[in-house]
Amino acid sequence: MLLSILVALCLCVRLALGVRGAPCEAVRIPMCRHMPWNITRMPNHLHHSTQENAILAIEQYEELVDVNCSSVLRFFLCAMYAPICTLEFLHDPIKPCKSVCQRARDDCEPLMKMYNHSWPESLACDELPVYDRGVCISPEAIVTDLPEDVKWIDITPDMMVQERSFDADCKHLSPDRCKCKKVKPTLATYLSKNYSYVIHAKIKAVQRSGCNEVTTVVDVKEIFKSSSPIPRTQVPLITNSSCQCPHILPHQDVLIMCYERRSRMMLLENCLVEKWRDQLSRRSTQWEERLQEQQRTTQDKKQIASRTSRSNPPKPKGRSPASKPASPKKNIKARSAPKKSNPKKSTS
């Protein structure tokens, strides 16, 4: 099972069942600061309750990592000692895949044996999940576009978002050069765009995360549609462009209709942002009902067309019609007709 992870926030949530969610925290283990994820949770897979304890334990492998005996050793160790923190797996952190452990062990154990050491039992590979039969992470399974210079800042008590220093090339960018096209909130727009999420939210902050990325932090108030679970808390909306379109300002109460991409909620130019009005709640629900009805009708037509094509196969083309055999009646009549005798020659 491919697990595509794009970590751009840390949410400290409380589960609906009344159990307190374990909070995510920034990775402080020096060996793991350049991993594709910047947030972790404790206890880790080796039962260390704090990162301070994990730091003391992972230090024993620093020399092994430095000699670069395996390209996946650092990844494997960090996945064990500083497991990635995600909203879906707060109470059961994701483990590294068995294949990652085996690669690290097979690469490094020969060197360890030269110094009379074996692969430690605490890092045994046998109990780890197999890639295609469980949830696990490997270097190939993580999709990330976060550069190495990303750092994390605490915006609110509930979340963390990335901050990145501007390059010299970004300084010329100005919102005044962007001309956003207004998307009208109509039924026709909704049916044609087929948005994957619709929410009522309040804009908390808008900040540029780089030359071609703008992060809009919103406080989700109502969820009318979603293709994956959306927490009722503050979440980031990502605009992967130098222009923030549609253009919105902090403290606005809005209806947002847009798309999800690689598990991230996007805010794109063809999305709809409308100042909130109470009637928008009922209207968006009605539009979604019409969209579902339209999709069912389209699906029914496809099924009918498929059944029709199977029951009425096309006639073969390119063959000349076969000549019709002679009528049996005509043949019988021809056979039964008396033969005419020739007149006898007269004798003299």
Curated annotation (Swiss-Prot):
PROSITE patterns: FZ, NTR
Residues annotated as domain NTR: 178-296
GO biological process: bone morphogenesis; canonical Wnt signaling pathway; cell differentiation; decidualization; female pregnancy; mammary gland involution; negative regulation of canonical Wnt signaling pathway; negative regulation of cell population proliferation
Region entry Disordered, spans: 289-348
Keywords: Developmental protein, Differentiation, Disulfide bond, Glycoprotein, Secreted, Signal, Wnt signaling pathway
Bias type Basic and acidic residues, positions: 289-303
Subcellular location, principal: secreted
Subcellular compartments: Secreted
Start-end of Basic residues biased regions: 330-348
Domain remark text: The FZ domain is involved in binding with Wnt ligands.
Its biological purpose: Soluble frizzled-related proteins (sFRPS) function as modulators of Wnt signaling through direct interaction with Wnts. They have a role in regulating cell growth and differentiation in specific cell types. SFRP4 plays a role in bone morphogenesis. May also act as a regulator of adult uterine morphology and function. May also increase apoptosis during ovulation possibly through modulation of FZ1/FZ4/WNT4 signaling. Has phosphaturic effects by specifically inhibiting sodium-dependent phosphate uptake.
Name of the protein described by the UniProt record: Secreted frizzled-related protein 4
Source species of the chain: Rattus norvegicus
